[in-house]
């Protein structure tokens, strides 16, 4: 979602790899614990995105954009030698290194939401929420399937990630086998679920 905001456009396609390496056998999980996805944008820009959920591993969230003259990071622009060309000089309320030492963006989101509620003013982030989520679905579908995915084709595909009528009695879309293990998406054979019913 940061790349979508930075580029002011949505990805056209994605391809990637992923897997389940560290989740404990028998732990209720049918999802990968790591993904590496390359997103392609209409202007020719390519974004490499990686994530992982490894206990005891490095825990950080950051973005870095590389251009012809250097790097753009949250709160700072440097050239290839590391010389700072620009640095955010505004308030520094966050102690997080991942936020570049600047105001924590997650706190800003909460502040804006709370202010809108208190002042009874509209705050509509539905478009950003929907396009951000769908960009993640695009990347995950690419890693699960092992095949390149196109944004518009996936958006138009006949599938549903949620049952039409979800109740406490609904059968989950993924259930464990007799040993308690959940099936994992397998590249080359994974297919999105068609419309599900409860």
Predicted stretch roles:
Residues 1-198:
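Contiguous beta-strand/loop segments that form the cofactor/metal-binding neighborhood of enzyme cores
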């Amino acid at each position: 979602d940061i790349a979508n905001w930075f580029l002011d456009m949505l990805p056209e396609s994605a391809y990637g790899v992923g897997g389940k390496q560290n989740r404990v056998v028998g732990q209720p999980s049918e999802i990968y614990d790591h993904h590496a996805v390359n997103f392609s944008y209409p202007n020719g820009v390519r974004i490499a995105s990686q994530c992982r959920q490894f206990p005891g591993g490095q825990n950080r969230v950051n973005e870095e954009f590389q251009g012809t003259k250097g790097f753009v990071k949250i709160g700072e622009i440097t050239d290839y030698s590391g010389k700072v060309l620009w640095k955010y000089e505004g308030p520094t309320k966050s102690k997080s290194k991942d936020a570049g030492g600047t105001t924590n963006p997650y706190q800003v989101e909460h502040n804006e939401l709370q202010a809108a509620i208190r002042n009874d003013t509209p705050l509509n982030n539905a478009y950003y929420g929907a396009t951000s989520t769908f960009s993640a679905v695009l990347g995950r579908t690419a890693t699960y399937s092992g095949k390149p995915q196109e944004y518009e084709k996936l958006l138009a595909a006949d599938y549903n990630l949620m049952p039409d009528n979800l109740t406490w009695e609904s059968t989950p879309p993924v259930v464990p086998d007799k040993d308690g293990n959940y099936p994992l998406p397998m590249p080359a054979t994974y297919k999105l679920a068609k419309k599900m019913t409860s």
